[in-house]
């Protein structure tokens, strides 16, 4: 009898897990859970073990070629490159077939996204300008964590109009493009000509694979791995290799198959349920030891939090509203400016993407206090934006 009861409970638990992973908000919930676990570990008696685990040296060697990095760097440079493969594929799909495929469809979210990148950077600069050592952090509040934002929106999925979801997705994709440009232009250092030549050869190989509509995903994975390693050694940030790989995968194969859709389907689950939660676990572990109330007035914390809480909604909503009033763009049918403002507030959830940019802006040499304050600013700004965004979205969509 006990044996049958155990089997019944096991089946019930499996069904609950399966039901959870089918939820639209599952990725966002898992992200939040990973971040909370990281913070609990960082502020518990296990904090040393947590940090030792993240700083565990991991080496890869093939002949004379070797990559030696700590586990957290493998997560940030390697796993996040895989995430950016997915970003590259999503951007390509939307540009050629989706919400960004025509001028009329693309211009409204494009203008909104520009505002959502420029104004947060300006807010950050205005608050942090007195300390030159903080100058590199201007890009941190520019980012939007699309997984979290869509997860919050999914909690209200039954009452959120479809055009509003499409607007958020298009906005986030253009936001990702902006982040890619920022990484390429401002966070690539000490370039190696030899590694760049290897990278160029790998890119040419990917272009040829695309040109001949090769559908075998393993071919892109092999060449992509070579590209990633070359880009990593070149001094350009390795996540850019992911974007190039994503763009190289063809939308359609020779026989009408859709390699990009197939690969996107595979990677989306890995991204939502493994890569991003792992990144959150590795980067959200902020220790509160030694932190006092006075730190809340720190220019770095205030600059990041204000950029996310104030800069994002002001930039997105302001640029959207002005573009429509000047006749540069048209408000999509089925949504209103109150809902646009709610989405703009929601886009202040920078979380994993902001933490990623912070890891590029402030390396280990910046000091523990700078890294801690930057992560605290991101957590504060993202939490406030998530709560306010949810409340505004609930109110504005209920009225519609």
From Swiss-Prot:
Gene Ontology terms describing biological process: regulation of pH
Cited InterPro entries: Na/H_antiporter_dom_sf, NhaA
A Gene Ontology cellular-component term: plasma membrane
Domain of life: Bacteria
Location relative to the cell: Cell inner membrane
Transmembrane region(s): 26-46, 71-91, 107-127, 137-157, 166-186, 189-209, 212-232, 233-253, 273-293, 299-319, 340-360, 373-393
Catalytic activity: Na(+)(in) + 2 H(+)(out) = Na(+)(out) + 2 H(+)(in)
GO terms for MF: sodium:proton antiporter activity
Keyword entries, A-Z: Antiport, Cell inner membrane, Cell membrane, Ion transport, Membrane, Sodium, Sodium transport, Transmembrane, Transmembrane helix, Transport
Lipid bilayer topology: Multi-pass membrane protein
Main location: membrane
Function: Na(+)/H(+) antiporter that extrudes sodium in exchange for external protons.
Family of the protein in this entry: Belongs to the NhaA Na(+)/H(+) (TC 2.A.33) antiporter family.
HAMAP family named among the record's database cross-references: NhaA
Protein name listed in UniProt: Na(+)/H(+) antiporter NhaA
Protein source organism: Haemophilus influenzae (strain PittGG)
High-level lineage: Bacteria, Pseudomonadati, Pseudomonadota, Gammaproteobacteria, Pasteurellales
């Amino acid at each position: 009898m006990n044996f049958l009861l155990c089997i019944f409970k096991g089946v019930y638990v499996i069904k609950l897990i399966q039901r959870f992973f089918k939820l639209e908000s599952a990725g966002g919930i898992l992200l939040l859970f990973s971040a909370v676990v990281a913070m609990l570990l960082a502020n518990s008696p296990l904090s040393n073990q947590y940090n030792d685990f993240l700083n565990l040296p991991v080496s890869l060697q093939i002949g004379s070629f070797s990559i030696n990095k700590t586990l957290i760097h493998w997560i940030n440079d390697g796993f996040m490159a895989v995430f950016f493969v997915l970003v590259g594929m999503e951007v390509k799909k939307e540009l050629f077939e989706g919400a960004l495929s025509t001028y009329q469809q693309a211009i409204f979210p494009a203008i909104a996204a520009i505002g959502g990148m420029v104004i947060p950077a300006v807010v950050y600069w205005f608050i942090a300008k007195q300390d030159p050592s903080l100058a590199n952090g201007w890009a941190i509040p520019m980012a939007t964590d699309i997984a979290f934002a869509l997860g919050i929106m999914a909690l209200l999925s039954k009452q959120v109009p479809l055009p509003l979801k499409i607007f958020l997705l298009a906005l986030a994709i253009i936001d990702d493009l902006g982040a890619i440009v920022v990484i390429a232009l401002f966070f690539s250092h000490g370039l190696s000509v030899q590694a760049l030549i290897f990278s160029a050869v790998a890119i040419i190989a990917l272009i040829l694979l695309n040109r001949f509509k090769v559908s075998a995903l393993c071919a892109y994975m092999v060449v992509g791995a070579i590209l990633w390693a070359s880009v990593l050694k070149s001094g350009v940030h390795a996540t850019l290799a992911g974007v190039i790989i994503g763009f190289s995968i063809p939308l359609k194969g020779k026989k009408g198959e859709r390699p990009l859709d197939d690969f996107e389907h595979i990677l989306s689950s890995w991204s939502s349920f493994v890569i991003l939660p792992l990144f959150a676990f590795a980067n959200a572990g902020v220790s509160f030891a030694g932190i006092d109330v006075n730190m809340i007035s720190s220019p770095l914390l205030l600059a990041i939090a204000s950029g996310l809480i104030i800069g994002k909604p002001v930039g997105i909503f302001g640029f959207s509203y002005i573009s429509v009033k000047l006749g540069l763009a048209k408000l999509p049918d089925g949504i209103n400016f109150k809902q646009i403002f709610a989405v703009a507030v929601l886009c202040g959830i920078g979380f994993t993407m902001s933490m990623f940019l912070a890891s590029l802006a402030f390396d280990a040499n910046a000091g523990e206090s700078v890294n801690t304050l930057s992560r605290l600013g991101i957590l504060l700004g993202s939490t406030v934006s998530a709560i306010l965004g949810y409340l505004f979205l609930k109110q504005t969509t209920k009225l519609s």
